[in-house]
């Protein structure tokens, strides 16, 4: 007979719930759920820091499974950026890295090098540029892996440095939070033009002097204007986005992707319908997205001393895809250490002011994104895609293996039930966590 016992531990403002199954003298951990208390939160503070991670010499770049492609130049620098929110009880770091994806094994390595923020409160996402070195350890057709492991470890160091510096630089701050449709040719769904989410969510951080010093842009798009076969290493459209935000007085930019799976990509179509794979097109799209984000947030009121909380939950998925099983088996980074047929990852939910943020460990299709945003509890509901892990595409069971168009994204999805498991676990976390502040009466 299995009996259940429950233990609660409070440390550094974090409430831990450990549920343990007990059979004889064998203890099997089942679930860890935590959330950060905010009853005596004190003054809200924020800080941001950036590190350049452009490799020297340049390395081949990856757009997914298979061999990387050589490059002969770079346009813009690859960076990692850390935005830290803090009050007297809670500290949360949001990290954006200019890579295709950043697996949890690397995220955990970076988290272990951070001082002052619980690892469960450090969210690490990838911009999903298709013009950066491979961080997965993909094998080529011959089984050879060319990922530069020293470079990967250096990136982990740079992430930790950025988080530590951002924490050191926190200052009293207020927030401007806004949601609106980004106008113009920025994104479209390659599979069906209009099946994408045009909403752009913006969190702008205002210093005591009344000036913005950081602007977070959350928008769903594949930064693949250039692609991996152009011979160019680049942050793609995200680099010009950052440059424009700073140039227009928005401070340091940080981009977090959204539910951009299947197949929400940059709208770089020329007059003849063919893709314009040029740096000039990166400049156009990145600049336009920055201008739209700044327009959307411009006239909203500041939120003084916003409430902050962070929840984290460990979830797991079965690995049914033969392709992804092979990828994990051959990778020096992704090789399973436990059950080879399951993967686990961290799911986060953040409340900050009137916004609620939920992480997605991969590329969820836009219909999943719309559904989650409807069910979340903030006045502004943000989804951070490719955050804390990058497990390929995330489809519902009715989409998986359906249209011929969905063949590729079904093969690069963990399995038929991936979307169902994720949605269920995400909404349970939403229900178990406090609702964010409401400013609209």
Regions from the PLM with identified roles:
Residues 3-4, 22-26:
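Positively charged n-region of N-terminal signal peptides that target proteins for export
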